[in-house]
């Protein structure tokens, strides 16, 4: 399978490939680690925070909890709609409690992180502290995460490597693999 080079990033578009994406997650791990803050669980927001949350959980050797949220739906995930927050958090054992690191891919408008923080305060009294970590923080975000890797003053659209799957269907995957085999 031939991999096409990424377009050049500019003030309006930030193009991120798989290698850069994974390196960015590792650099965010370093930012959180070097802060010295000790937390008990990682809570990632599905879907954008799933990959970073998984990496954080593995590296810090802490339980991973998942909270599903959704707001980007229309036009292959590029238009923000109403925010939906799942009622329940998925955890492998016990409950969500103690100091929680909330992980997502980015702070765009800030609405998701802000509402999730309030959701946790209202519904999870055993959570004693929540801090947030994202790879990218846009200047337009009304919510400033505790930890972020990159501040984006021009608010570009971030083209993440997995976005190609937003508009891909099974028959397209089959055709692509057939061409590659």
What are these regions (language model features)?
Residues 1-181:
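PRPP-associated nucleotide enzymes
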């Amino acid at each position: 399978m031939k991999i096409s080079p990424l377009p050049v990033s500019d003030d309006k578009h930030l193009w991120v490939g798989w290698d850069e994406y994974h390196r960015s997650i590792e650099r965010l791990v370093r930012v959180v680690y070097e802060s010295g803050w000790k937390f008990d669980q990682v809570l990632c927001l599905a879907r954008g925070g799933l990959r970073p949350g998984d990496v954080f959980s593995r590296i810090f050797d802490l339980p991973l909890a998942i909270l599903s949220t959704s707001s980007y739906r229309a036009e292959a995930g590029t238009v923000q709609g109403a925010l939906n927050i799942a009622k329940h958090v998925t955890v492998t054992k016990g409950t969500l409690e103690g100091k929680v690191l909330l992980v997502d891919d980015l702070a765009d408008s800030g609405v998701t992180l802000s509402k999730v923080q309030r959701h946790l305060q209202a519904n999870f009294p055993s959570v004693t502290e929540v801090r947030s970590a994202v790879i990218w923080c846009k200047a337009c975000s009304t919510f400033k995460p505790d930890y972020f890797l990159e501040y984006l003053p021009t608010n570009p659209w971030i083209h993440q490597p997995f976005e190609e799957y937003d508009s891909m269907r099974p028959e397209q995957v089959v055709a692509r693999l057939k061409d590659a085999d």
